[in-house]
């Protein structure tokens, strides 16, 4: 309802603002399970045209209030999200989970009371370290979309293995690999796994803070869960629950092999970012973009590992 | 454009003016990138030599500057004939030129990583044996500070422990009698633009054959990324030994020998 009114207002205001960039977030939650909605982010890089709204978000209705998993990139997004979610459930937001440190998931918490925002201790530490830099980067890319957004840290450290909201219980899993602290959640009532950025689906995984062996271990744990479906951090809903897990693993395995082969056969970084991407990833959004980012993340380390030392003592 | 036509008209109407030298007109072609620094850099790098933008030379780089301290670039001028010099520069960097390379006995190809201090044109310029310069490049969007933030090795504090470490390998390239050399250095490549850290950078590097023949030589500047990595294609056969010598602004020398492998490793990854 609120969206319709907002859209109408935006339409009425158009003549007055003609020529100005439209910086209103259009948030469309889609029901995916009983009492759970997914907001599908743009499966693209962070860009002014999408306002940085690229991460998926979950809205969960419980007997005692509304829960959110992730909060979007900005104060404006967080405020719109809060209004949309509360309009949907008719209950106030009482908990916001932040799955990991990255700003497309966590800068929107600026719209909420820090006391209701929960994240893994590691993620909070990492946000305190990198948040300022992320904030600068988003302001540079997104301009007015970010207006008023301040860096806020979650006020609650997740140390418990589950949290109960009037009978709706969420299992909270402290994992790692996409970052040093990745939260995954399992809704016990529906069997829905909310994977955060441990899961990418039809959208290439991003690796700026990745530890690939730990990521594989985490994917192993997720694959063994008794879940029925999965809501990935980026990309469409996965009704099978296993496809996003398998696809994420397939990509990071291929990525490591391809970059290792590139270093060992003498390619430079530009060439490594231009290697063919296998046909099975053809449906993956932002594949070339993420490959080239990953080259930047991993290449120096792989060179140090695979190129032999050749220096002679200083004479 | 309109201004150019106006000038032409003026010249046509005043025959006397044609005899006057230097009508305050830039001797360089109009910059397709519309960079504010084009003429200044052109004067510095090209001087009185002829210049043109030419699609036959390629400056290759990724679609996103993921790390403004280390932006990969490759300048490829294979197929345009003999090349004397290859220059990689970024117009709006405080240290614009990154590398000035002379491929004496090498294919005209060089790849490295550079710092970007802001959104800037990044260019490659190639001088043919005739003296003609060919230029290519594009605007690259980047977060600021690549040249004015301290290098990672200064932050972690371990740069001195690894200074002078070199890694490298060389592989034969097909049938052309050329080999691909990759060489990396551990070096902070301090720009002098960070408070209380003076300029400290590798400033020259040569690659010679085992008999001492100069294959390629270059001047490097502090806008080359920390821990420089360089890819060249010297004309040597499998089994040859490449001798690499570099020197930094403190006079420290760096020397390495890299044998060219007997076999190409291209089975591992497709060569572009």
Q: What do the PLM-derived regions correspond to, one by one?
A:
Chain A
Residues 169-225:
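Active-site-proximal loop/helix segments of hydrolase catalytic cores
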Residues 78-79, 83-161:
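Active-site HxH/HxHxD metal-binding segment of metal-dependent hydrolases
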Residues 31-84, 184-196:
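Conserved beta-strand hairpin/beta-sheet module of binuclear metal-dependent hydrolase folds
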Residues 265-315:
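C-terminal regulatory/interaction regions
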Residues 22-31, 125-174, 179, 188-189, ...:
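Metallo-beta-lactamase
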Residues 214-271, 275:
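Divalent-metal (often Zn2+) His-rich catalytic cores of metallo-beta-lactamase-fold enzymes
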